Amino acid sequence: MEAILMIGVITLCVIFLLSGRNNKKIQEARELEDYLEDLNQRIAQRTQILSELNEVITNRSVDKSVNMSACEIAVLDLYEQSNIRIPSDIIEDMVNQRLQTEQDVLNYIETQRTYWKLENQKKLYRGSLK
């Protein structure tokens, strides 16, 4: 009888130890899953940063023949297709600004066109010439 009791106690101890190991393995698996999820989030963030940097590099690349960036050339092509002439003063100032995106270039050109339109509409006062 004592032998059966000993075997029962040993069996319970073995079951208890094995269940403890399984809990540790489950906990380790959860920790690894959390770590992998964190790594995937980091990879997604780094991929987004990399794509933004690639876009900046593309926008900053300068065409040596005209000394303008790709986004400036693209916006000027849009104006050319629309048969809108841009004064050379605006283009020279735009090149010196080194704008980053096509939207920035477009906004700058439109602002300058509005300014020069208003400036060119000014009239000389009649009493100024005598």
Swiss-Prot record:
GO terms for biological process: DNA replication; viral DNA genome replication. Keywords: Coiled coil, DNA replication, DNA-binding, Early protein, Host cell membrane, Host membrane, Membrane, Transmembrane, Transmembrane helix, Viral DNA replication. Residues 70-130 are annotated as: DNA-binding. Pfam families: Phi-29_GP16_7 (PF06720). Gene3D superfamilies: Phage phi29 replication organiser protein p16.7-like (1.10.8.600). The chain crosses the membrane at residues 1-20. Its main location: host cell. It is found in: Host cell membrane. GO terms for molecular function: DNA binding. It is a single-pass membrane protein. GO terms for cellular component: host cell plasma membrane; membrane. The record marks N120 as: Involved in oligomerization and DNA binding. Binds to the long stretches of ssDNA of the viral DNA replication intermediates created during the protein-primed mechanism of replication of the viral genome and attaches the viral DNA to the membrane of the infected cells. Required for the redistribution of replicating viral DNA from the initial replication site to membrane-associated sites surrounding the nucleoid. Required for the second pull step of DNA ejection. This is DNA replication protein 16.7. It comes from Bacillus phage PZA. The gene is 16.7.
